[in-house]
Structure formats: C-alpha cells, structure tokens
C-alpha cells in the first residue's frame, strides 16, 4: 500500500480557496467520483494546519493506493489533468494558484497498520 502526500504551503487566509479546489466545492476541483472510480484507489483525506508561529498555512492532500502503479495511472489520467487544469502531460498548471507559496510531494510505503481493538462488554 502506498500513501502519497502533497503538502501545499499557502498564504494565511488562502487555505479555504485551495480546499475548495480539492473538494470540488466550487465546481472545478477533484470530482469525488472521478478519483473514487480509479482502480487501486483506497481513500483520500485533506488536512489543514494553521501554525501559530508561521506566516503561512498548510493544506496536506493525502491519497491511499493499492500500489505505486495505481497512483501513477491516476496522475496520467485525463480526469487528473482536468482536475488540475492541465491540457497536456505536463507539470504546467492553470494560472489560478491564488495564495499558493509552494508544495512538496512525498510517497510512502505503508509498512505497518494498527487498527483499534474492539472490546466486548
């Protein structure tokens, strides 16, 4: 299992704009059904942090995949390109990057999972 994170650093106050782009709340973000129907997709979470001692906020996009191949197939898909404002297989994105300072993508292999234990009463 693979977890991919995209940590997006944004100017203070700009996080809601970025969150809407990923949740599809403004009509042009990740349509839930597009990623949910991708073979090998296991889940998606969006995290938001407001560090008090920093002049920025962070939005962390996390996706869980059966394999690295499944995740790479999503990135190559037309649905991914459309959701990210791309028309070609390129890193160039739409110009609407309001408030985004930068981002960092990381891939992790899951080596252990601890699930909660159910205690019978």
UniProtKB/Swiss-Prot annotation:
GO cellular component terms, semicolon-separated: cytoplasm
Localisation per UniProt entry: Cytoplasm
UniProt KW keywords: Cytoplasm, Heme, Iron, Metal-binding, Monooxygenase, Oxidoreductase
Transmembrane residue ranges: none
Single GO biological process annotation from the record: heme catabolic process
EC number(s) from the headed UniProt entry: 1.14.14.18
Sequence ranges of Basic and acidic residues compositional bias: 78-98
Segments of this protein annotated with the region Disordered: 76-98
Binding site for Fe cation: 6
Family recorded in the similarity comment: Belongs to the antibiotic biosynthesis monooxygenase family. Heme-degrading monooxygenase IsdG subfamily.
Subunit structure: Homodimer.
PANTHER family in the record: HEME OXYGENASE (STAPHYLOBILIN-PRODUCING) 1 (PTHR34474:SF4), SIGNAL TRANSDUCTION PROTEIN TRAP (PTHR34474)
Identification of the protein by name: Heme-degrading monooxygenase
Gene for this chain: isdG
């Amino acid at each position: 299992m693979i977890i991919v994170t995209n940590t997006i650093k944004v100017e203070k106050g700009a996080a809601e704009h970025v969150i809407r782009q990923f949740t599809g709340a403004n009509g042009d973000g990740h349509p839930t059904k597009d990623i949910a129907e991708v073979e090998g997709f296991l889940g998606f979470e969006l995290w938001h942090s407001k560090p008090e001692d920093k002049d920025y906020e962070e939005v962390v996009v996390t996706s869980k995949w059966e394999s690295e191949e499944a995740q790479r197939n999503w990135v190559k898909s037309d649905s991914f390109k459309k959701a990210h404002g791309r028309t070609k297989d390129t890193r160039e994105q739409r110009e609407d990057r309001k408030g985004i300072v930068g981002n960092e993508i990381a891939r992790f292999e899951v080596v252990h999972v601890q699930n909660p234990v159910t205690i019978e009463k």
